[in-house]
Regions:
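Glycine-rich, basic loop-to-helix element that forms the pyrophosphate-binding segment
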Residues: 1-11
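Conserved donor NDP-sugar-binding/catalytic core segment of glycosyltransferases
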Residues: 24, 28-59
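Acidic donor-binding loop at a coil-to-helix junction in glycosyltransferase catalytic cores
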Residues: 103-112
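Active-site-adjacent helix/loop segment of glycosyltransferases
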Residues: 121, 130-164
Length: 164
């Protein structure tokens, strides 16, 4: 998240495209789709569909195909967001940068914060990128523990969840 904020500080345009080193665009219109949807909804962030590569592990393929569906989703209260292939409104980011207190789900924490401030986050499935390692980067138990700690904190006010 620190590196994301450093990069975002250098952006001089109205929006910043984030594309992970593990991602590759599916086609030449992927970025145009993100921009188009951001303009239509005045969204703080738009993220695209991520699909596995031929070399992705089965566990990553499963996760990508499960999470990144084929229907647009407009999030206003309880968002999901994945910054590996996304477009972020820089004016919103200047008000609400990525938290440096969280590692691994800083994008979801950011989305929750911007939605809490009245902004929208959009999932746009017509914007597509390949993602080699997917959401969880294989089966790293130490990463899973770190992410679960952060998720529990993010969901601490959920009435139906109890982590005691």
């Amino acid at each position: 998240s620190r590196a994301l904020n450093i990069g975002m500080k250098e952006v001089e345009s109205d929006a910043a495209l984030l594309l992970s080193a593990h991602c590759a665009l599916y086609n030449e219109v992927a970025i145009e789709k993100l921009i188009e949807v951001q303009d239509i909804f005045s969204a703080a962030g738009v993220f695209g569909r991520q699909i596995p590569t031929k070399d992705s592990l089965d566990i990553d393929t499963r996760d990508l195909l499960t999470v990144f569906g084929r229907e647009r989703i407009v999030y206003e209260k309880h968002p999901f967001f994945h910054n590996a292939f996304s477009l972020i409104d820089t004016s919103v980011w200047k008000k609400i940068p990525f938290s440096t207190e969280v590692n691994g789900i800083e994008d979801r924490v950011w989305a929750y914060q911007v939605c809490s401030d009245g902004y929208k986050v959009i999932y746009e499935p017509s914007a597509v990128a390949y993602h080699e390692h997917g959401l969880n980067q294989g089966c790293s138990n130490s990463r899973a523990k770190r992410v679960v700690r952060a998720l529990k904190s993010l969901h601490k006010n959920d009435e139906v969840l109890s982590f005691d």
